[in-house]
Amino acid sequence: MTLTAERHDTAQPENAGVFERTDFPTDTAHEQVTFFQDPATGLKAIVAIHDTTLGPALGGTRFYPYADEAAALKDVLRLSRGMTYKSAIAGVDLGGGKAVIIGDPATGKSEALLEAYARFVQTLGGRYITAGDVGTNSDDLDVMGRATDYVVGRNTSAGGSGDSAPMTALGVFQGMRAAAQAKWGTASLAGRTVGVEGTGKVGYQLIKLLLADGASVVATDVNAAALDRVARDFPEVKIASSVIGQELDVYAPCAMGATLTDESVAAITAQVICGAANNQLAHPAVEHDLGERGITWVPDYVANGGGLIQVAGERLGTSADDVRAQVEKIFATVVQILDVAKRDGILAGAAADAVAEARIAAAR
């Protein structure tokens, strides 16, 4: 069934599951929320389209074992709204959407389920374009591509743009350089110490860029294999059990979200924070604490937009060179955001939202 933000039918029992309800709250500002299920494969999925002012809604499909259907709905509503802002700030002609598949990908994922999901995506007629996210990868997207035209992020062998980690890392690097310029008067990171938390695909690529720019790097990761790879490939990198609390100029959270807590902010010595992780703030008041300490934070959805720009380019037929040039413009975007924040006496997060909202408003 398809439920829109305008629809609000008769009340249902409070313990009814999402797939058993016919009511929907009217205060989400989403254009469309669609619930899909396929009993034959066990598929239960939700697609949320937040805003299509700038173009079709783009956002990844998250395959995750949510505690219940209400938790899945809450997550997809939050994530899809975030994608609207991420697309707007990245300068791509796409809107914001997201999808979740409820279940454990380790045990519940199958080609039949992915194809069933993709057939449902196809029925949306291009209003929503899917991509990878937690629990889905390029191989899964290749499978989806058998049943829908509206998927990006596939392997190059399947006509996709391939791994987006290098472009994501480049965007973070450019955001970091812009913050450095605002903080120290120069965009160069030469002689600066950067703590990279998370040395997976994006963190690894970021370390390469930092070292090439002359920075010293301290790195940590809960994944021993990922950290071993960094130690092997970049012997000049200092390996640590934690980077928070180290003497740093820049902190780059590139792993899980919510690492910026009341406690961690009190321990951070860095004057710039810019990383690839999503949802870095444990709660909104943390950004106020960062501002009180004079720490420049680059909003995560701005810094990590390089991957989005790449997959958007795949959909729009943009050349690799043009994609790279657009990712490098994240530098100018961050400069603009920090200038707005300083001029208006607001936090960087609010300034980023204002810039994104202005672009959306101009297109209406």
From Swiss-Prot:
It catalyses: L-phenylalanine + NAD(+) + H2O = 3-phenylpyruvate + NH4(+) + NADH + H(+). One of its GO terms (molecular function) is phenylalanine dehydrogenase activity. Pathway: Amino-acid biosynthesis; L-phenylalanine biosynthesis; L-phenylalanine from phenylpyruvate (PDH route): step 1/1. The keyword Oxidoreductase applies. L-phenylalanine binds at residues 86, 278. GO terms for biological process: L-phenylalanine biosynthetic process. Its EC number is 1.4.1.20. Has been used to resolve racemic mixtures of D,L-amino acids to yield enantiomerically pure isomers for pharmacological and peptide research uses. Keywords: NAD, Nucleotide-binding, Oxidoreductase. It is an enzyme of class 1 (oxidoreductase). NAD(+) binds at residues 62, 133, 164, 168, 255-256, 276-278. The keyword Oxidoreductase applies. It comes from the Bacteria. InterPro entries: Aminoacid_DH-like_N_sf, Glu/Leu/Phe/Val/Trp_DH, Glu/Leu/Phe/Val/Trp_DH_C, Glu/Leu/Phe/Val/Trp_DH_dimer, Glu/Leu/Phe/Val_DH_AS, Glu/Phe/Leu/Val/Trp_DH_bac/arc, NAD(P)-bd_dom_sf. Transmembrane segments: none annotated. The active site is at residue 98. PANTHER family: LEUCINE DEHYDROGENASE (PTHR42722), VALINE DEHYDROGENASE (PTHR42722:SF1). Belongs to the Glu/Leu/Phe/Val dehydrogenases family. Catalyzes the reversible NAD(+)-dependent oxidative deamination of L-phenylalanine to phenylpyruvate. This is Phenylalanine dehydrogenase. It comes from Rhodococcus jostii (strain RHA1).
